[in-house]
């Protein structure tokens, strides 16, 4: 069982790398990395000692109610009604007490009929705000203060209903629930694609009503620590091949690791040891509501598999296309050099220069059949891992011409065979 579990068995083509290097696990234990984004898209950020925290929440009370949790929402919903009933019930009881209605004197016309205790005043307040109207208790024309209190309670009840019910409906229709149906692959992969080293991950929408259009964005967040122990974070955008997508079927997002990529100089070992996080966001519009949504996820080095590619999930049938969701997370090991994209470009440039200079050295062609050697992908990998090689003399270079030609041919065939 490998470091990533039994579902992702690691197989390399070079015997000196029997599995993922142990420094991958050692580096992970050495540093307790805390990610900025969890896999579900929630931010791992805690704010403390915010200036004017409660004041800012109360100014935008509607957004505060929408963002709060459902259990807190239920408590606020219940307390808003119960407290308003108690407050206005107390006011009606004070009016009755001041007017002498609690004495039950038949010569006194009460402000509110049949209110002779606090319980009766509370029930009258509840009936007024909820417009139940049993008819046993009612306000009279004797006290203008009681009439004004009924008017204020009716207005306040409309305001409470607007905020509480509106916030509850907005919370149920929030975009976060729709974002949970957008799924990112748990692992990101690095492998060869069209002859280039690429970083890939997969996005899928598993609802019947698919998104209309969407934009994918990726950023590399690198953590660094200065001499004083202060942590700094630097963001850099990753250029994507397919950033504008229609998510009808699962799509593999591709980032070519070229000279503009922050991963350009990182080989397999460097990726395992580095301290970075890849933040991916998907902003899209739903076809059922027409509202904008956003889904997020992230990948850290231990969630990046080197030398893998995703399984195909799309099957072509006679009348429709079939998506096999069981293969969404599946990947298979493929050939990928252990060196960085920078070293690959350097080696490709050297081989291209060798091809250009080979016609001018016809004396070397007569010696092509004298030396026959077997080549494998290990030779390509080994040559990529040592970009700084000694310069050969013209005589030795002529002798190595068959080897270099075979190496060039094998390198291109190996890359094309993965497509």
From Swiss-Prot:
Xref: Gene3D superfamilies: 1.10.287.70, G protein-activated inward rectifier potassium channel 1 (2.60.40.1400)
KW Plastid (keyword) present: no
Bilayer topology term: Multi-pass membrane protein
Means of activity regulation: Channel activity is strongly regulated by variations of cytosolic pH; channels are activated by alkaline and inhibited by acidic pH values. Activated by phosphatidylinositol 4,5 biphosphate (PtdIns(4,5)P2).
CC terms in the record's Gene Ontology section: basolateral plasma membrane; monoatomic ion channel complex; plasma membrane
Annotated keywords: Cell membrane, Ion channel, Ion transport, Membrane, Phosphoprotein, Potassium, Potassium transport, Transmembrane, Transmembrane helix, Transport, Voltage-gated channel
Coiled-coil annotated residue ranges, if any: none
Tissues with expression: Abundantly expressed in the proximal and distal segments of the nephron.
Sequence motif Selectivity filter, location on chain: 131-136
GO molecular function, one term: inward rectifier potassium channel activity
Domain of life: Eukaryota
Intramembrane region residues: 118-134
Annotated localization: Membrane; Basolateral cell membrane
Topology Cytoplasmic: residue spans: 1-67, 172-419
All ranges on the Extracellular side of the membrane: 95-117, 135-143
Listed transmembrane segments: 68-94, 144-171
Main location: membrane
Residue(s) carrying Phosphoserine: 358, 374, 376
Site feature: Role in the control of polyamine-mediated channel gating and in the blocking by intracellular magnesium: 161
SUPFAM superfamilies: E set domains, Voltage-gated potassium channels
InterPro entries per UniProt: Ig_E-set, IRK_C, K_chnl_inward-rec_Kir, K_chnl_inward-rec_Kir5, K_chnl_inward-rec_Kir_cyto, Kir_TM
Catalytic activities: K(+)(in) = K(+)(out)
Function: Inward rectifier potassium channels are characterized by a greater tendency to allow potassium to flow into the cell rather than out of it. Their voltage dependence is regulated by the concentration of extracellular potassium; as external potassium is raised, the voltage range of the channel opening shifts to more positive voltages. The inward rectification is mainly due to the blockage of outward current by internal magnesium. KCNJ16 may be involved in the regulation of fluid and pH balance.
Subunit structure: It forms heteromeric channels with Kir4.1/KCNJ10; this interaction is required for KCNJ16 localization to the basolateral membrane in kidney cells. As a heteromer with KCNJ10, may interact with MAGI1; this interaction may facilitate KCNJ10/KCNJ16 potassium channel expression at the basolateral membrane in kidney cells. May form heteromers with Kir2.1/KCNJ2. Can form heteromeric channels with Kir4.2/KCNJ15.
Family: Belongs to the inward rectifier-type potassium channel (TC 1.A.2.1) family. KCNJ16 subfamily.
Annotated protein name in UniProt: Inward rectifier potassium channel 16
Native organism taxonomy: Eukaryota, Metazoa, Chordata, Craniata, Vertebrata
Gene: Kcnj16
